[in-house]
UniProtKB/Swiss-Prot annotation:
Gene: dauA
Pfam families registered for this protein in UniProt: DAO
Influence of temperature on activity: Optimum temperature is 37 degrees Celsius.
First-level EC class: oxidoreductase
Cellular component GO terms, alphabetical: cytoplasm
EC identifiers of the protein: 1.4.99.6
Species per Swiss-Prot/TrEMBL record: Pseudomonas aeruginosa (strain ATCC 15692 / DSM 22644 / CIP 104116 / JCM 14847 / LMG 12228 / 1C / PRS 101 / PAO1)
Anything else known: In vitro, it is essential to include phenazine methosulfate (PMS) or iodonitrotetrazolium chloride (INT) as the artificial electron acceptor in the reaction to ensure DauA remains active with FAD.
Name of the protein this chain belongs to: FAD-dependent catabolic D-arginine dehydrogenase DauA
Gene3D superfamilies reported in the protein's UniProt record: D-Amino Acid Oxidase, subunit A, domain 2, FAD/NAD(P)-binding domain
Any one biological process term the GO annotation gives: arginine catabolic process
Subunit structure: Monomer.
Site keyed Important for specificity toward positively charged substrates: positions: 87
Induction of synthesis: Induced by growth on D-arginine, D-lysine and 2-ketoarginine (2-KA), but not on L-arginine. Repressed by DauR. ArgR could be a transcriptional activator of the dauBAR operon in response to the presence of L-Arg.
Length: 375
């Protein structure tokens, strides 16, 4: 039996970021069932940073993460975590009221937010079909996130603090014994006073193993594809383009273009694969909105995004199980919120108040707590 202060189940962005901040305060062991961390969600993300997206809780967590992303600790990564990538939300359905609503809510958080007419939007992304565009919002503060550098930085930090990240360690049995949690894997057994459930789409399954009431987590599939831009088209400096009704998005990606129908199809937690219909839908919508022709995607994939009923993230102790801490329901926001979410989770696990710089963004324990979901 290997002893630790904190056992974290799941080495995706939720478990990695929480373990990173916890590792300064005790021995952390992260148990990951796959051969590599982040296989199901983190490694399949489009990874874009924008404050003007998501629920108020998500926006607060995203804003509170920016300082860490802009100035990570020395040695955390070898190059910047963020690179400029503005976001342009385009109205293709002639819905000026919704465009104005999104502009005003975004500008309250991002003073640099601009409202564009159709000509301005088309000048920024010249392949847009002018007759299909009715206006846009433009957030110049958006950025691409180097997901791998961020994720690996968290995992390295755990190891530097004498923690362990153990892949191919699936939790087979979880028991509460003499005031501690014991987790049995094929490769060995582990014990700690605190068990952090950061298993992504499998969080409810882990709770079931532990005899803890589930959150009602719903995994959802999102499909995406990569395709080449037309010859002679330089798309490097295009913004991330999102349709106002969130029916698709398009963004430059290492000289190629990444597209998605922005689907959120309820599924069981599994090694999700893209559906041909999803990919075809995304291609059709992009071709309808732009002059781009997508002959055949270079690569297609799908990832899992997991939600609870209110769409917010969860960080807090279970009401009915001592020492069982949820870090769950990252939805599509886990990477852009990871710095604040990891630091907040680590504080709450240790029964400490949230750090002042997180509270300054309007975050508090109650808005993260799983108890808000109780009937």
């Amino acid at each position: 039996m290997i002893e630790a202060d904190y056992l974290v189940i799941g080495a995706g962005i939720a478990g990695a970021s929480t373990g990173y901040w916890l590792s300064a305060h005790g021995r952390v062991v992260v148990l990951e069932r796959e051969a590599q961390p982040g296989y199901h969600s983190t490694g399949r993300s489009a990874a874009h940073y924008t404050v003007a997206y998501g629920t108020p809780q998500v926006r607060a967590l995203t804003a509170a993460s920016r300082a860490f992303f802009d100035n990570p600790p020395a040695g955390f990564c070898e190059h910047p975590l963020l690179s400029p990538r503005p976001e342009m939300v385009v109205d293709f359905s002639d819905d000026p009221e919704e465009l104005r609503r999104q502009y005003e809510s975004g500008k309250a958080l991002v003073p640099q937010m601009r409202l564009l007419d159709a000509e301005q939007a088309c000048s920024i992304v010249p392949v847009l079909r002018r007759d299909k565009v009715f206006g846009a919002t433009y957030d110049p503060t958006g950025a691409d996130i180097d997901t791998d550098a961020l994720h690996q930085g968290y995992l390295r930090g755990i190891r530097r603090n004498q923690g362990q990240v153990l892949c191919n360690h699936e939790a087979l049995e979880i028991r509460r014994v003499d005031g501690a949690w014991e987790v049995r894997c094929d490769a060995g057994s582990y014990r700690a006073a605190v068990l952090v459930n950061a298993a992504g789409a499998w969080c409810d399954a882990i709770a079931g193993l532990a005899g803890v009431r589930p959150l009602g987590l719903q995994p959802k599939r999102r499909s995406a594809f990569i395709f080449a831009p037309p010859p002679g088209i330089d798309c490097h400096d295009w913004p991330m383009l999102v349709s106002l009704d969130e029916s698709f998005y398009l963004k430059p990606d290492a000289g190629m273009l990444l597209g998605s129908p922005a689907n959120a199809d309820p599924v069981e937690a599994h090694d999700v694969q893209p559906e041909q219909l999803d990919i075809a839908t995304g291609m059709y919508l992009i071709e309808e909105a732009t002059t781009l022709t997508i002959r055949r995607p270079e690569h297609t994939w799908a990832g899992l995004r997991s939600f609870v009923a209110d769409g917010d993230l969860v960080a807090g102790y279970a009401a009915n199980a001592e020492g069982f801490f949820w870090v769950a329901a990252q939805g599509g926001y886990g990477i852009q919120t990871s710095a604040a979410m990891g630091e907040a989770s680590a504080a709450l696990i240790r029964h400490q108040p949230l750090p002042a710089h997180l509270r300054e963004h309007g975050l508090d324990e109650a808005m993260l707590s799983p108890r808000r979901l109780s009937p």
